[in-house]
A protein has these predicted regions:
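Divalent metal-cofactor coordination and adjacent catalytic microenvironments
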Residues: 35-107, 131-148, 157, 166-169
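Internal mixed-charge
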Residues: 2-6, 11, 96-203
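Flexible, active-site-adjacent loop/turn segments at secondary-structure boundaries
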Residues: 17, 22, 52-54, 58, ...
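Short linear functional motifs in flexible/disordered or boundary regions
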Residues: 27, 57, 152-153
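N-terminal start-of-chain detector that recognizes signal peptides
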Residues: 27-29, 89-92, 113
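Short, extreme N-terminal leader segments that mark the start of a protein/domain
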Residues: 1-40, 195-203
Length: 203
């Protein structure tokens, strides 16, 4: 039997239940202050978790093209982390500044070529897999209770619940990312030579 993935509305209602409040039927229109806060906390945690870079929101060898006339490289608003492939662009040290790439090595926003990059994107809640939704919901619910009530004894979810949910997410991400010793880790081409959540798992 297929189990439906957690929706954003369900996630918010889980958070509302954690403070003993009734569920809501919609997240549009004029909402109570605590619902708005729950929604904001969920979005905050969603961005925080996705910023780590997982298989579901990381794309490798993406060509970032220069803008005609300026030769600047403009970024979309859903880019969380980006880095050029150091093997293909050894003379460039580009970082994100606002919605542009900036070359720290040459002190300029102007690039002489398009760049091949590894990019972590911010996906919407409905685009991410269920283990990620579950972990984000539990983490957000715990933070929401702490902020609104401030009483650890009223927590519906404990830190252990959060740890277990993260472990499931990491295991799922490890499988989906095709990590293995023979083929290597496809995500370790540039920016993520230092860290990728599921690469921390000991097999």
């Amino acid at each position: 039997m297929t189990v439906a993935a957690t929706t954003e509305l369900e996630a918010v209602n889980i958070m509302m239940a954690a403070i003993g409040e009734s569920p809501v039927n919609t997240l549009t229109g004029t909402l109570p202050a605590d619902v708005v806060m729950a929604q904001s906390t969920l979005a905050e945690v969603n961005k925080e978790v996705q910023s780590e870079g997982w298989s579901f929101n990381t794309e490798i060898d993406v060509t970032q093209q220069r803008t005609n006339g300026t030769n600047h490289i403009d970024l979309s608003t859903d880019v969380l982390r980006i880095d050029p492939n150091i093997h293909q662009h050894p003379t460039i040290d580009a970082i994100q500044r606002g919605l542009k790439l900036y070359d720290r090595l040459n002190n300029t926003y102007v690039f002489s070529e398009d760049l091949i990059c590894t990019i972590v994107y911010l996906r919407t809640f409905v685009e991410i897999p269920e283990p990620a939704r579950r972990y984000i919901t539990i983490k957000a619910a715990r933070i929401f209770v702490d902020r609104l009530v401030g009483d650890e004894g009223l927590r519906t979810y404990t830190q252990q619940d959060e740890i277990r949910a993260r472990a499931i997410l990491m295991e799922t991400d490890y499988v989906n990312a095709d990590h293995n010793l023979l083929r290597g880790d496809p995500s370790l081409t540039s920016i993520f030579d230092t860290y990728n959540p599921s690469s921390a798992l000991i097999r």
